[in-house]
Amino acid sequence: MELDAILDNLSDEEQIELLELLEEEENYRNTHLLYEFTPYSKQREFIDAGHDYQSDVLWLVTSLVSHLLALLKSRFTLPGDTRERKVIRLMVNMAESGKVSVSMSQLSSGIGGETNETVTKTTQRILCGRIEENDEPGYGSPKEDSSWEKSSVLLILLIIFSLSHHRLMVLKMHSICYFKHTRRHRHAAGDTITAYGLTKRLPYSIYAEGLTRTNKYGQFSILTFTPLMGMSDGVTKFLKNPSKSQKVVNMTIYDAEHYTDEQKEQIIASYPEHEREARARGIPTMGSGRIFQIPEETIKCQPFECPDHFYVIDAQDFGWNHPQAHIQLWWDKDADVFYLARVWKKSENTAVQAWGAVKSWANKIPVAWPHDGHQHEKGGGEQLKTQYADAGFSMLPDHATFPDGGNSVESGISELRDLMLEGRFKVFNTCEPFFEEFRLYHRDENGKIVKTNDDVLDATRYGYMMRLRQDDARY
């Protein structure tokens, strides 16, 4: 071995010194495991969100990853010295972007879970190690920089975790993290803190109480969950009606880059059939019925170049506070098969900005649009349809309807679902915004379609409705 060869050339004293250094290095690595963490693309999106949003949610399918990501953010929210700032930038490969904010002051934060057990066996274990075993380190802090106070009731439960650091390497400070279970509302209350993190599908009242603790410092909070047990009111609030300051990131098993495709399919197949969508993609159980109860694999396909004989139409759904969406639909008229080939979706973008984003594939392609394109107030002055036409879009003369003049949402969704079931509606696997909506589209307790987070689906429906009135547009 290489080490043996090196040791053979050293004196006894040098060998002892080298072995001590190697042992010290190994101990350091064991107590700084988080520094070596390299995020996957979806994890990085979650980390990035802390720069632009006050509240961000990681909606996952594996609990270990969710807790690790939550603690990643918690661990590097606490300290702020120069060494830590360099480490976090290196760790997430973002030195050039400047998107990671690291405080240079003494901070306090809170981490909550459903019960004492979920706190000790998830977030606390990952950050601090197994307290009951003493010798197993956590992924976050070196022991020499940290201290803690145990609960007098449950000895393996920490109530306060303290981390010492330096401001500008001169002034020594102590940032602290409170661990709490939140089974009862009162346990979420407490002192004013800088940041708050929650795991699992907690009631929204618990989340709101934790958020209140951070009002003074800007309401920074994070939430991670796997929606296996369905939609709690907190999950519902984030997934269906997020505010401008809230960001939701959905990470599926297909975003776990350490698994091969074969391993992913093997893992999914090992779960009971009724749990697979929740386990694999984080799709919550809809109490009143998910509309597209169709496996994604049956409609996904690899991208390909558009053949000359395909008919092509674009379509859009207007939006400002909620996202606007632009899609491109291809129709193989001979086989009567439709392909959703391109998708773009974004909030608070003008017609000119939207055109700049999709011009490369939307130029001179007819665009189907909904009836609210006749409105003036959203853009102030000209009709929305006119604004988009002036920006460069080839807007069809009339808003989207079926050939008989109707525009029923139910009819459109029913026809698209039938096409999917018959294998005649395919979606390029690059169109992730479509699948994010597809997974959650459902009916309320009265059986009506819930019209939120459906921008891409609406645009797709408009394109399908107007497929016969596109003036034979082809590439």
Curated annotation (Swiss-Prot):
Annotated segments matching region ATPase activity: 1-282
The keyword Metal-binding belongs to this UniProt entry's keyword annotation: yes
Keywords: ATP-binding, Endonuclease, Hydrolase, Late protein, Magnesium, Metal-binding, Nuclease, Nucleotide-binding, Viral genome packaging, Viral release from host cell
Domain writeup: The ATPase region is in the N-terminus, whereas the nuclease region is in the C-terminus.
Assembly: Interacts with the terminase small subunit; the active complex is composed of dimer of terminase large subunits and a nonamer ring of terminase small subunits. Interacts with the portal protein; this interaction allows the packaging of viral DNA.
Enzyme nomenclature, EC number: 3.1.21.-, 3.6.4.-
Stored InterPro entries: Terminase_6C, Terminase_large_su_BPP22
Binding residues for Mg(2+): D317, D455
Pfam families per the UniProt record, alphabetical: Terminase_6C, Terminase_6N
Job description of the protein: The terminase large subunit acts as an ATP driven molecular motor necessary for viral DNA translocation into empty capsids and as an endonuclease that cuts the viral genome to initiate and to end a packaging reaction. The terminase lies at a unique vertex of the procapsid and is composed of two subunits, a small terminase subunit involved in viral DNA recognition (packaging 'pac' sequence), and a large terminase subunit possessing endonucleolytic and ATPase activities. Both terminase subunits heterooligomerize and are docked on the portal protein to form the packaging machine.
Name of the featured protein: Terminase, large subunit
